[in-house]
């Protein structure tokens, strides 16, 4: 599967892999930040910018919600 954000294209096998790729390439990630902490921080930023709450209980749901909000785009 291919997904695109404003900066990159991600080739992944699952939505969980997509979240992991976003985490690994994030410019907002702190050096010692965990995946869960990073997802919470992203959810806070999305809430502040767009007024939408994102469920970050799992990497799969997190990525699905980013796609459903149009923050990530599937490439066919």
Annotate each PLM feature.
Residues 1-29:
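N-terminal acidic leader/helix
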Residues 2-4, 41, 55, 62:
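Generic detector of bulky aromatic hydrophobic side chains
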Residues 17, 34-37, 61-65:
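Exposed alpha-helical structural elements
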Residues 24-51, 55:
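Acidic, aromatic-enriched beta-alpha/helix-loop junctions
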């Amino acid at each position: 599967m291919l997904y695109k954000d404003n900066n990159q294209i991600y080739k992944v096998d699952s939505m969980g892999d997509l979240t992991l790729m976003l985490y690994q390439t994030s410019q907002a990630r702190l050096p010692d930040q965990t995946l869960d902490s990073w997802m919470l921080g992203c959810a806070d930023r999305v809430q502040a910018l767009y007024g939408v709450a994102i469920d970050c209980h799992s990497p799969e749901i997190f990525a699905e919600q980013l796609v459903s909000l149009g923050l990530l785009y599937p490439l066919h």
